[in-house]
Amino acid sequence: MPTHPSYTPAHGAQPLVSFIVPTYNLPVDMLRESLDSIMDLSLTQEEREIIVIDDGSINSPLAALADVIDQIIYIRQPNKGAAVARNTGLGIAKGRYIQFVDGDDRLVRSGYEHCLDTIRFQEADMVVFRSSAKEQESMGTASDRGPMSGSDYLRHNNLRSCVWGYLFRRSLLGNLRFHEGITREDEEFTPQLMLRAEQLVDTDAVSYYYRKREGPVMEADDNRAKARRLDDLLTVLDTLTERLDRLPADDRAALQRRVDQLTMDYLVNIITYTRSARHLERGLLRLRRRGLYPLPTKHYTNKYRLFATMMNNKAGRKVLLYSIPLVVR
């Protein structure tokens, strides 16, 4: 498949933010709405870099973007999935900061301007913001927490791992890239990146609107897809647990919390997908072999502690097998 790169004119100064926008078979008006939400920000053309990665769409959107082609970098590549597309964007990006934006989503201007002010005036390494599936503007004055280290944030908060949920300094990356070929790459990438942040600001500003995805992306009724998602989550757990022994104590405690909560997610998914005691016991055996079961009964949250206590005994597992499918319907 041919590629069609189109580069913005060189302006000399480094862009403040590189926006990486993967797209695949999206309606052009939806992609355009996403790009317009970036171009409508207070950033000048010199301060922003918009990188559109077309992951092998059947019909290229390039012709429909002709009027903004001088404001974007467009790369077309064979379809290899979101992780490869994002890695391609990271390889091109020149901005001081990186923001991922899925091609069917958009930024919320009022909230995102607050994030831009945070990196301009506080020199934050990372800004974690709120997202919404409802079309709205941020309301009222934003409330911030921090700056704090990424390790401190992970130790005391439930992580929202979606890579479009934060703005981060590009220099944090080093050689960190997305794990290609799996479906849960965000879960592996985000905690490792966050541990590298020394100055993290958490804001309640709603800065991102995401569309709830249905159909082929979710593959909700495909048993093979469900099995793959479970296997991929085990792969993520393997990667993160392998990192634990290399970390200093505070970082290890931070990542351990994330591992424990992902282990809970794995078990909840088994119950939700299969409603089968046999499949659950098989999953517990896989976790036991990895040293991840029995679950540690730490008080990360009331929900986690209750779940861990119940999952660690036979009677509790029976209750969870019956109750969880009712809760998540």
Regions found by a protein language model. Name each.
Residues M1-P5, T272-R329:
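Membrane-interface aromatic/basic loop that binds lipid-linked glycans or pyrophosphate carriers
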Residues P2-P5, L26-L41:
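Short, well-formed alpha-helical segments that are part of the catalytic scaffolds
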Residues Q14, A93-R96, R109, A124:
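Active-site acidic short loop of glycosyltransferases
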Residues P15-S18, S37, E49, E188:
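Cell-envelope/extracellular polymer assembly enzymes that use nucleotide-activated donors
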Residues L35-P78:
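Acidic donor-binding segment of Leloir-type glycosyltransferases
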Residues L62, Q77-A93, F100:
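Glycine-rich, basic loop-to-helix element that forms the pyrophosphate-binding segment
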Residues A82-A83, D102-D202, Y210-A227:
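Donor-binding/catalytic cores of nucleotide-activated saccharide
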Residues S207-E214, A220-D250, N269, Y273-L292:
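Catalytic core of nucleotide-sugar-dependent glycosyltransferases
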